[in-house]
Amino acid sequence: MNFHSTKPLSYDSSDNEIYNPFLVSTNEEGRVSPTIDKQQQPVLKRAKSIVSSNSLSAFFTDSKSKQQQQQQQRDRKRNKDRRNRPGRLRRSHSTNSNDQFIMNTGSFKLPDQDEFQFTMNNNSDNGFSSSTSSSDLESVPDLTDDNIDELTPETTPIKPVGNFYFNTLFDNEENTDGYYYKLNSQIKIRNELQQQQQQQQQQRLTSSSPSIFEIPEIVYKIISYVDEQNTILPQESTPIRRNPLSYKHALLIHGDKKSAQSALQKTTNQQSQQNQQPSSVISSSPLYNCLLVNKLFYKITSEIISTKFYSHNEQQLKKFIENKSHQQQNSSSPIIIQPKTFILHKLFQTKQIIFDQLIEFINFDQLSWFELYMCPKISLDKPQSQTFMKIFQSCSNNLTKLIITGSKTIDDEFLMKLGQFKCGDNLQILDLRACELITDFGIYQLSLYCRNLTFINFGRKPISNGNGNGGGNGGSGRYITDNSMIKLINNNRKLSTIGLAGCHITDKCVWEIANKLPNISRLSLNNCPKLTNSGINQIFTLTNTPNSNYFKCLSVLELRFNHQLTDLTSIIKFKRRQKFQFNIILLLELCESLMLKYRQQEFELDKLISLKIFQDISHWVNDYNDNDGDLSYNEIKHLINNNNNNNSSNNISTRGF
């Protein structure tokens, strides 16, 4: 066998110092030493042993490596289904020999060790003995790199040893070995994954849950509130008090000059505001902004807008008809709106042709409020057109409010058809003011079908008597009398508002109203020439009795232009009775002449009441014959004298003591 000899080391290896040929240090004696201090030395590599393949060392090394390979194969089979713990070093449990311990842990660095420390056998002395044989080099572990070109037979820099100690997720676990540690770690990882999945699901649910502005029912309520709060329909509002006819009239109503002037100024301002209010309100409606939010808002807002159709401008109405007709030509399906409210307000010049074109795009099945306010040229009962059939036959079950004022075509036949199509079954508000062709016959026919009316108005415009204040006895009001009104009152006991201005009713109708309608709150009897002074006084005198139930809820009474009324004392007492007994402030509407009579008679009544109060007080003070327990003047004088005598006698007796 051929052996490759090596040169002996140039220093004693028992000092356990590392030789670095590239650095030189000087001792105290001045000689050069190839050794350096451990704290200043760089990391060096240990020389790799070069062993011949024919040597005994190679033989033992090969056999030893084969045994290690076999042992590794057994370990792989044993740990095939097991997973090694990452980042932890397993210590060998075998402590039979120091060599095995050196084999398992000699190549690792502990935190409290130096850069490298040779492991000593038990059989060796205090240090490594220098030897020229290859067996000494075989005991040194191989710590060189795989790059053989950089190796030399002599010593080379040592490869730095890495620190294999680091923290893991389960450093706080007491059981860090074996099957239980693996099971606990798997359970913890599984729990963490489940928690992450739950959090992700919750995030998905929260992100996928719709907003309240994406729920159609809530959006519908929101837009409905916006519509109710901001949409002002073009209609005549009920005034709190009618406008004064003149400055003298305002002075009689309010009592002082400042109040009269402010009342006249308010009337002029209200008239100007009523003329400007509809256009400004309609153009600034917030519903048009709701159309621009999103598709859902647009759909619901357009549905709510289509439930109310109203117009007060003839030009806008014509544009609407043109747009609808153009859309109808471009689309295959008919474009029809279905409103619940239909109002045409003060369209004095609108003709029947425009109205017929308009109703072609409207379905009246859900109609509950139909109003034609001062549209005199529109007819609803024209024989050639089926206007009445299209409107009122389809909405007979839903119609609750019918207002047609100032029409020159509405007559008794129209009211008869309303009853025949059962439009009066649910009708509650009926306003037919200034419809000159309606007579007792039509009202009587309508009263046979209407049972739920709460508001009626058949008022007529008074004819001027030459003074400009009305009060004439002519006009169409003579066609409405007690014959129809008493029948209507008897069949509708829920009436609370009645307007009979200009009608030729008598005291009998007023008596039926007081006797049959306990809920009456507003009564308009302006310019009723058949009313008499004696009848009105008797009715209101009976209401002033203690046990009377007549007109208990009456809060508005209009008696303008009834110049035949001369005695208003019963009405004055009734007004005071409403205030003190029922806490109702009665609003009494009178014309200028009647208001003057009212103030004069009220002043005379106050004088009479004050005189009676003074007489009662004087009678109570000076009455001698009434045995009511009060002492007379002589008795009081006698008691005073007796009192004085007793006091003087007491003073004399005290002086004697």
UniProtKB/Swiss-Prot annotation:
Annotated keywords: Cell cycle, Cell division, Cytoplasm, Mitosis, Nucleus
CDD domains in alphabetical order: AMN1
SUPFAM superfamilies according to UniProt: RNI-like
Compositional bias ranges of the Polar residues kind: 94-107
GO CC, any one term: cytoplasm
Domain of life: Eukaryota
Entries under SMART domains matching the protein: LRR_CC
Coiled coil: none
One GO term of the biological process aspect: cell division
Compositionally biased region (Basic residues): 75-93
Chief subcellular location: cytoplasm
Compartments reported by the entry: Cytoplasm; Nucleus
UniProt-annotated stretches for the region Disordered: 57-140, 262-282
InterPro entries associated with the record: Leu-rich_rpt_Cys-con_subtyp, LRR_dom_sf
Biased composition (Low complexity): 121-135, 270-282
Role, per record: Negative regulator of the mitotic exit network (MEN), required for multiple cell cycle checkpoints. Required for daughter cell separation and chromosome stability. Involved in copper sensitivity.
Family of this protein: Belongs to the AMN1 family.
Name by which UniProt lists this protein: Antagonist of mitotic exit network protein 1
Organism: Candida albicans (strain SC5314 / ATCC MYA-2876) (Yeast)
